[in-house]
């Protein structure tokens, strides 16, 4: 019983170590290669065991020194289920291995190519599929339209006719949609009919204007002619009156002296009367000339008056400009005074906060500073003093201490303000020079 159990156990162990190869899987390469190597080891083990068996006793087991596995080797009469790997079987396996090696380089690229082709077919973008379907539908619709045209027309249409038909259809579609057609070239060309009509209209308008002016001109011309004739008639009438007066005077003289003895007296009288008439004519002419000269002088005076008026207007405008300039100067001085007032207020706060002057003179200085600020606020300070203070402030902002010191030295001589106010200003500016500016430069 123990021997039978041992035999069964050995068979099961060997079956697990060397499972039998099924008939269908003999063609696969990796399993055949995996099975080929262990039999070789087994054969070598069996050969070693066969050589070692005669040295031991017949009933004893294999020696433990040469055991290569945990399980004991197969007994002498054990026959496995699969065909024993013999020496004659090894060349077949070797030949089959050679065949597989020969077939591998030819078979593998084909399989790879097939797999690549399959992968391309399997993985497709859905967008491409939709595009292909749309293209197929378009092609089918075009084929249907072509077939319908061939059935309807019966005769083939040339390309030129097709192009013209397409243009007509496009024009019809545009008109139906309400789209404006392109501007024709004729609209930009010269149009003789319209221009002739316009020319006729302009000519008619000119003729009408000419008629109107001709109708209006006679009245004006008539008035001017009447004026000229009146002036000429007045001159002629004055000359005729003079001649008639002369003749009447001569007749009176002849009637008064009919005696021959008085002919000489008549001659003398005529001569005297002629002299008198000449003198009268001269006086009249002088009076008329005086009137004319007076009228001319009046006209000249009227012409010269604009110059006087222009001079008067220039004087007025000069006065206005002077007033404007004075107003501008006042505004500038007020702005300067306002900026100086703010500057002095801030300086006063810093000066008395630091406690630079703790003597009894500090109270008087504070009172003088208040008076100075009141004058600046009320704009009662002279513009010259304001300009000097503004100049000193600009020098302080520029940090030009040398020029500022020189200006402070010259300030009491050139300013017109009281000495107390001048002391306040010199104290404030010197405070800036000695205390504030050095701190800023050190920072």
UniProtKB/Swiss-Prot annotation:
The modification Phosphothreonine is found at residue 277. Residues 205-226, 250-266, 297-332 have a biased composition (Acidic residues). Keywords: Acetylation, Phosphoprotein. This is Glutamate-rich protein 1. Residues 87-97 have a biased composition (Polar residues). The modification Phosphoserine is found at residues 238, 254. Residues 42-54, 281-296 have a biased composition (Basic and acidic residues). The modification N6-acetyllysine is found at residue 12. It comes from Homo sapiens (Human). Residues 109-124, 159-176 have a biased composition (Basic residues). InterPro entries: ERICH1 (IPR026719). Residues 15-333 are annotated as: Disordered.
């Amino acid at each position: 019983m123990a021997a039978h159990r041992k035999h069964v156990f050995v068979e099961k162990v060997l079956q697990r170590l060397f499972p039998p190869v099924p008939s269908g899987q003999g063609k696969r390469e990796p399993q055949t290669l995996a099975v080929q190597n262990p039999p070789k080891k087994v054969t070598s083990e069996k050969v070693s065991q066969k050589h070692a068996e005669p040295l031991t006793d017949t009933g004893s087991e294999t020696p433990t020194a040469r055991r290569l596995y945990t399980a004991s080797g197969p007994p002498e009469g054990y026959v496995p289920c699969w065909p024993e790997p013999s020496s004659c079987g090894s060349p077949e396996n070797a030949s089959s291995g050679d065949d597989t090696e020969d077939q591998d380089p030819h078979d593998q690229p084909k399989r790879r190519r097939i797999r690549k082709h399959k992968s391309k077919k399997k993985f497709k973008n859905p967008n491409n599929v939709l595009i292909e379907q749309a293209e197929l539908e378009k092609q089918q619709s075009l084929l249907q339209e072509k077939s319908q045209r061939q059935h309807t027309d019966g005769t083939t249409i040339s390309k030129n006719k097709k192009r013209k038909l397409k243009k007509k259809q496009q024009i019809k579609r545009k008109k139906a949609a309400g789209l404006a057609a392109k501007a024709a070239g004729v609209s930009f060309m010269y149009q003789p009919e319209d221009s002739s009509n316009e020319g006729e209209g302009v000519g008619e308008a000119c003729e009408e204007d000419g008629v109107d002016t001709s109708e209006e001109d006679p009245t004006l011309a008539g008035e001017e002619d009447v004026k000229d004739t009146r002036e000429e008639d007045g001159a002629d009438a004055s000359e005729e009156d003079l001649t008639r007066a002369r003749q009447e005077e001569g007749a009176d003289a002849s009637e008064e002296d009919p005696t021959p003895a008085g002919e000489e007296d008549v001659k003398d009288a005529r001569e005297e009367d002629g002299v008198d008439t000449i003198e009268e004519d001269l006086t009249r002419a002088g009076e008329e000339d005086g009137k004319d000269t007076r009228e001319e002088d009046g006209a000249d005076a009227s012409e010269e008056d604009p110059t006087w008026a222009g001079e008067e207007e220039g004087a007025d405008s000069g006065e206005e400009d002077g007033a404007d300039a004075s107003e501008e100067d006042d505004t500038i001085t007020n702005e300067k005074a306002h900026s100086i007032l703010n500057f002095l207020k801030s300086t006063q706060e810093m000066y008395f906060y630091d406690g630079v002057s703790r003597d009894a003179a500090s109270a008087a200085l504070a009172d003088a500073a208040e008076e100075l600020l009141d004058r600046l606020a009320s704009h009662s300070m002279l513009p010259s003093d304001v300009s000097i203070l503004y100049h000193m402030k600009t020098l302080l902002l520029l940090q030009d201490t040398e020029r500022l010191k020189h200006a402070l030295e010259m300030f009491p001589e050139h300013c017109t303000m009281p000495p107390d106010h001048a002391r306040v200003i010199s104290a404030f500016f010197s405070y800036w020079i000695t205390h504030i500016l050095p701190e800023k430069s050190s920072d």
